[in-house]
């Protein structure tokens, strides 16, 4: 299996693992590399609605803090997926998509160095 196919298979498995841990909805992940820094972009579809001209988009920074505790540096997250689950239980089915943007990180060291200041 060549490297590209292996990488694609690995990314699909990672996204499926992430989606299985969400309370509701699904996430697509993309990685952007700029110079020596990487940034993960997560597109969260809480209600899996069709994206159309009525869809509202919310852009949130610090995506590593939004969904799963294992992604955070301190072991706690906002779990916004659970908030959307509560909305679904109260019959709120919003046509919304969350664009979650991670802080820029420089990989390849024992600890990835962040460039949070670059976000501001």
Outline where the language-model segments fall.
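Bacterial Sec-dependent N-terminal signal peptides
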Residues: 1-24
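Flexible, glycine- and charge-enriched loops at secondary-structure boundaries
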Residues: 6, 34-37, 73-77
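A domain-start/cap signature at the N-terminus of enzymes
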Residues: 18-57
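Extracytoplasmic/secreted envelope proteins and their assembly/folding machinery
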Residues: 41, 58, 81-85
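Short, flexible loop/turn elements at secondary-structure junctions
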Residues: 47, 63-65, 105
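Beta-sheet entry/capping signal
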Residues: 56-58, 97-98
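Structural cue for short, hydrophobic secondary-structure segments
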Residues: 60-63, 100
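Active-site machinery of serine-nucleophile hydrolases
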Residues: 67-120
């Amino acid at each position: 299996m060549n490297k590209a196919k292996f990488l694609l298979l690995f990314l699909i498995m990672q996204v499926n693992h992430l989606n299985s841990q969400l309370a509701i909805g699904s996430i697509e992940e993309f990685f952007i590399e700029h110079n020596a820094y990487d940034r993960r972009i997560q597109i969260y579809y809480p209600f899996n609605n069709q994206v159309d001209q009525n869809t509202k988009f919310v852009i949130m920074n610090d995506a590593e803090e939004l969904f799963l505790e294992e992604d955070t540096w301190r072991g706690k997250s906002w779990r916004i997926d659970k908030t959307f689950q509560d909305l679904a239980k109260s019959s709120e089915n919003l046509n919304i998509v969350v664009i979650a943007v991670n802080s820029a990180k420089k990989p390849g060291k024992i600890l990835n160095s962040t460039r949070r200041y670059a976000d501001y």
